[in-house]
């Protein structure tokens, strides 16, 4: 949400010179932008500032038995681009090469330098029990995998890659400002679910 320098000073208990100096620095770096005018009760209008949504992006990839889904979101969790293509999962390097090729085409509006600078990371959701630390699919009925290393997929990207169970990833994608306590059910080729307590 947008705010003002005065509000930042009050909320963080900082002096105005400190706030002005930091805001100037963030504006110059493009991390924040001026978003219009801010009119708090009983005060004159001031320039409002907020996060620059296009300062950084994150990419999401959904792997299923027969499809590959891709999405790009900005810092406001707004979908900038999305695509779903038919791609049958196979457990060898040819699949990794295809995923890398499709991802490169999906991000073709960014050059290599922009991708390294602006892309924070890639989240990959997979149906099954995932060990994120070991980059391992412990078991997946949908993909017919067991104790399967995901390192080959991680190597397809030059940014951090995070793996998650598909239902858990879908739960995290929901707006937790609206749903403080929620259960997510995934009804696809297999039944899955995730839950969130207290936001």
Identify the meaning behind each predicted range.
Residues 34-56, 163-184:
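Conserved phosphate-binding catalytic cores of ATP/NTP-utilizing and phosphoryl-transfer enzymes
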Residues 45-82, 182-199:
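Gly/Thr-rich phosphate-binding beta-strand-loop-beta motif of the actin/hexokinase/Hsp70
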Residues 11:
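Residues within the alpha-helical elements of helix-turn-helix
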Residues 82-181:
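Glycine-rich phosphate-binding loop and adjoining helix at the ATP-binding site
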Residues 1-7:
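Short capping segments at the starts of secondary-structure elements
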Residues 8, 19-32:
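Basic amphipathic alpha-helical segments that dock to polyanions
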Residues 4, 33-34, 39, 131:
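Short beta-strand(s) of the beta-wing in winged-helix/HTH DNA-binding folds
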